[in-house]
Amino acid sequence: DASPEWVHRHIEQLKPVLQRNSDVVLCLQAGFIGVWGEWAFTDHFVRGPKTPEEHALRKEVMIALLDALPQNRQIALRTPMFKKRMFLDSYDDTLTLATAHNGSDMSRICAHNDCFGADASDMGTFTEAGAREFWQQETKYVMMGGETCQISRYCKCEPSLKDMEDYHWTYLSGPSNISDRWETDGCYDEILRRLGYRLIITDMHHTPKPQAGESFRMVLELRN
């Protein structure tokens, strides 16, 4: 991976592009550090960090990314541990209805799991007590997405549907052998239907004969 200096230079180069095109950015996975940009197996950042001090270089990258995007866009971290070690005192410090969607850095840090259903810990995604519960609470208010990476008993239909509901998944990609398994086992259509937002207009009322220069009133009833 690139050195911290080069990572920050890359982010500065991307900042005007991200700002200019933020309207088509769902969220931004933090990336930049380690193999696959998943913040592990790094040559230039501390490998296997445990303390806030060992996370300091990563935190600087995260702060730069938060600055590179407008306040109404979120940055996704690969594991719940990273948010805790860089910004929080414990896994109990979750977002709430009162602290979500207020433009603060904490309200803009979301989640991505790039080994959904791969094994008991999702290949190191959940390695600490409280980590799962933390993301289950946080993702009520921030994006949750990622990808699958290998076949296991944890990506069968029943556990997959439960995890997607528990963690409020919005988007998912990954190898086709897993989606093929879901299709064979009969849950693919439900997963496809429930991912993300499907806003449907159930009723609509508007000013019947609007005139140029006059106010126009519309009432929409939407269902997700």
Say what each PLM segment does:
Residues A2-W6, P16, P49-L57, D189:
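Conserved aromatic-histidine-acidic binding/catalytic patches
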Residues C155-P208:
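Catalytic cores of secreted or luminal carbohydrate-active enzymes
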Residues L222-N224:
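Short amphipathic, basic-aromatic surface patches that mediate peripheral association
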Residues W6-R9, Q13, L57-E60, A64, ...:
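Extracytoplasmic/secreted proteins, especially bacterial periplasmic and envelope-associated proteins
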Residues R20, C27-E38, T42-I178:
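Catalytic-core regions of glycoside hydrolase
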Residues D1-G31:
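Substrate-binding cleft of extracellular glycoside hydrolase catalytic domains
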Residues E214-M218:
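Structural beta-strand segments of beta-rich domains
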